[in-house]
Regions:
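Hydrophobic, small-residue-rich alpha-helical packing segments that form membrane-like cores
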Residues: 208-214, 219-227, 234-282
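C-terminal motif of bacterial Sec signal peptides marking the signal peptidase cleavage site
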Residues: 14-16
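C-terminal functional module detector
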Residues: 18-76, 80-83, 87-134, 138, ...
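A conserved hydrophobic secondary-structure block that centers on an alpha-helix together
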Residues: 165-168, 184-187, 200-210, 215-216, ...
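The substrate-binding groove and active-site-proximal loops of carbohydrate-active enzymes
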Residues: 65-70, 159-172, 223-236, 328-338
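Papain-like cysteine protease catalytic cores
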Residues: 175
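Low-complexity, serine/threonine/proline-enriched polar segments
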Residues: 133-157
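Sec-dependent signal peptide recognition
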Residues: 2-11
Length: 540
């Protein structure tokens, strides 16, 4: 299947085994981080018309509980080495390396809940290695290992810490290591690094005692400085409490945003039309959500959350990389409330009713890799979960033992429902004046961003009143487009004139030619949300 990018403009928004082994840190420490950043920043030339930068803000290392258990031993330093184009070791032993150019920006996003706890449990002599759960977790009985892992997963889901192993000092230490690594590897103008982590809230269906849950995860990204202690689902499973904490951080001078991901398996809760506690949405909710969550991660290894065939029956590509199983289950997620295009349209309805829109977000892509680096290419794909899905046979994508067919082969249910349905997605694209924390973060705040499923095509869009057709041949096209309108992510103020749009796209030279450029329009009219698709340009 060819990878693609859908340029969606909606409404008025343009928009467990072994001990630990580390990888050698090859960072040059001859200068302090502050000296290095100041020196590099002084040499950067800003481009007022902006350049596109590609990055990944969803990456896990051994400090995530659901990575270490699957033999992941990579560190935050490995994340940044991979982003720079260096090879790092996959848990099964082979080396992985990014295809194409190095990334422009990146962030390590280990789970805040139990960050660094499993490595401590697996360290000889550490107090946590002596607790019964650790002995079971790193024992030899697969069934008991699974039960021990489920104990931690159940704690994350419930928000109730498992006190025997929950040591906040260890979490704080792992978080500091992540921050320090981001600061060490920050090279303004070359590689922008962000301190970040994942907030891992999970919903539960009423009356359902299974482990199935809806994904309400967010990646929390700090512009520059980060606090000594993070806020995880073991503090509260309510994302609105996370926003309150983020507001406090911002008041202390530390700007921060949360980026939701995998709304496709949120059981319809990510873009629900009520609050977490089931109350009606109001203006205050909408304004707080947009301040804290201006972006959503629309595509990644566990599927694409743009739309669904049931929501967009007239869109022939609405089934692209659809993944529907709830977390840790084979139960299908509810569709409504789980997809971006529907949410953007519903946001217009809510704005009419409350005076504010809670779903006026931009989009990015990311990998959600748990092995320090994403594949981004189906031709060289190592999936996500360490030793579980590193090869086509392990993923259930090819028959075992050299067989040519699946006849007589018993299919592994986890591979059948999960691994074989995942893909080599995705990347965030950001239009910014320069490759620095301040500039990249500001671009994300204003939503001048887009998502790709891996390829690095360049896409721009502007809306305005009075763009002339000869603008396409103007040497100053971009400058005039900015001067006469707003870019993707901006708000185009309504007037009595029909708007015009400037759309520009360039293929990734390492990937397939562009097949089609489309605009997707969503609007709210006469009590109904509607959607239409327009072909802007098509290949021969």
């Amino acid at each position: 299947m060819n990878k693609f990018l859908s340029a969606s403009i909606l409404a008025v928004t343009l928009g467990a085994c072994g001990g630990q082994t580390g990888t050698e840190n090859k960072t040059d420490h001859s200068k302090s981080p502050a000296e290095t950043v100041e020196s590099a920043a002084s040499e950067i030339v800003k481009n007022p018309n902006k350049d596109v930068f590609f990055g990944d803000l969803h990456i896990h290392t051994k400090n995530s509980f659901d990575a270490y258990i699957f033999n992941v031993r990579s560190t935050p330093d490995d994340v940044y080495r991979f982003a720079k184009g260096e090879a790092v070791r996959h848990p099964v032993g082979f080396e992985i390396k990014i295809g194409g150019d190095p990334l422009d920006f990146v962030g390590t996003t280990d789970h805040g809940a139990y960050m660094g706890i499993l490595p401590a449990m697996d360290t000889d002599g550490h107090p946590l290695s002596k607790v019964e759960l650790a002995k079971t977790m790193f024992g030899t009985d697969p069934e008991l290992i699974t039960q021990a892992f489920a104990t931690i997963g159940g704690s994350v889901r419930s928000g109730i810490p498992f006190e025997e192993i929950y040591d906040r000092d260890i979490v704080d230490s792992a978080w500091k290591q992540s921050i320090d690594a981001a600061n060490r590897h920050y090279e303004p103008g070359k590689l922008t690094t962000f301190s970040a982590y994942e907030y891992t809230s999970v919903t539960v269906r009423p009356g359902d005692e299974s482990f199935a849950g809806g994904n309400l995860h967010r990646n929390v990204v700090f512009e520059n400085e980060a606090p000594k202690r993070l806020f995880s689902t073991l503090d509260s499973t309510n994302p609105e409490d996370l926003w309150d904490w983020m507001d406090t951080e911002r008041a202390a001078g530390r700007d921060v945003m949360a980026i939701p991901h995998n709304s496709n398996v949120s059981d319809g809760k990510m873009f629900d039309l009520v609050t977490y506690e089931g109350k009606p949405l109001d203006k205050a909710y909408a304004e707080q959500r947009m301040l804290n969550e201006p972006l959503v991660e629309m595509t990644q290894v566990k599927g694409t959350s743009e739309t669904h065939p049931a929501l967009s029956p007239n869109d022939e590509w609405a089934d692209f990389e659809i993944y529907e199983d709830l977390l840790s289950s084979y139960i299908k997620s509810k569709i409504n409330g789980g997809y971006v295009r529907e949410a953007l349209a519903n946001g217009l309805k809510i704005e009419q009713e409350t005076g504010a829109n809670p779903f006026k977000f931009g989009m990015i892509g990311a990998s959600d890799t748990h092995v320090a680096g994403g594949a981004f290419d189906e031709k060289d794909y190592w999936s996500k979960v360490g030793i579980l899905d590193a090869t086509p046979i392990a993923r259930g994508s090819a028959p075992p033992g050299g067989a040519k067919t699946w006849e007589g082969v018993e299919r592994d249910q986890n591979a059948e429902h999960w691994f074989s349905k995942w893909g080599a997605s995705g990347l965030a694209a950001v239009w910014a004046e320069e490759n620095t924390r301040e500039s990249i973060f500001a671009a994300m705040r204003r939503k001048e961003t887009y998502a790709t499923s891996g390829p690095r095509m360049k896409v721009r869009m502007f809306g305005g009143y009075g763009y002339d057709t000869d603008l396409l041949d103007d040497a100053d096209m971009i400058a005039k487009a900015y001067a006469g309108g707003v870019p993707m992510g901006g708000d185009l103020v309504k007037n009595n004139t029909a708007p015009s749009f400037l759309v520009w796209a360039m293929r990734d030279p390492r990937n397939a030619p562009l097949q089609r450029l489309q605009m997707v329009k969503s609007w709210y009219e006469n009590g109904e949300t509607r959607e239409a698709l327009y072909d802007i340009a098509c290949s021969d």
